[in-house]
Amino acid sequence: NTLESGQLVLNDSGAESPMHYASDITRTFPVNGKFNKRQKAIYHIVNEMQFEAFNYCEPGKSYKDAHLKAASIAVEGLKSIGLMKGKAEDAVATGAHALFFPHGLGHMMGLDVHDMEGLGEDLVGYDDKKDRSDQFGLAYLRLAKELEPGFVLTVEPGLYFIPHLIDQWKADKKNNNFINYDKLDSYRDFGGIRI
């Protein structure tokens, strides 16, 4: 396919140092170099999700709570453009945000891009204080436990408009009290933004 003006490109890449330490960076940019009004609005929401989650992260705080903070910011931002409604806290508790943010906030990083996950995500990212959720979206959070000094991790939120998922949730009337499906139809061709 040929990239066209008005489309977005999402680049998720990294490099490895001679000492074998990994990096990971994700950015989304417009093909023509200029975001349109809708793209700019979604980009600003994702940027705020990242900024607030990043600032929340410090030793002793759980990464799961950073994820939930980003999810709450997503709901508030999507409410501001008419795609969601209701109290953000309630929408996040029911998982309504996961229609747009269906993955975890990030992961640990070190000698591997997803550091030590070969041992098992539950062993690395969870402990006796934090169990993995079975809620859609939150179940894909790779790291939930309390952060410790020296942890290296990514903070890479995203918002996506996945037609198949939208159709499925709309048909099931899932989270109708939080999602404005009528307005959401105009975003079916949007794609997504992650940073």
What are these regions (language model features)?
Residues 1-195:
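Active-site neighborhoods and metal-handling regions in enzymes and metal-associated proteins
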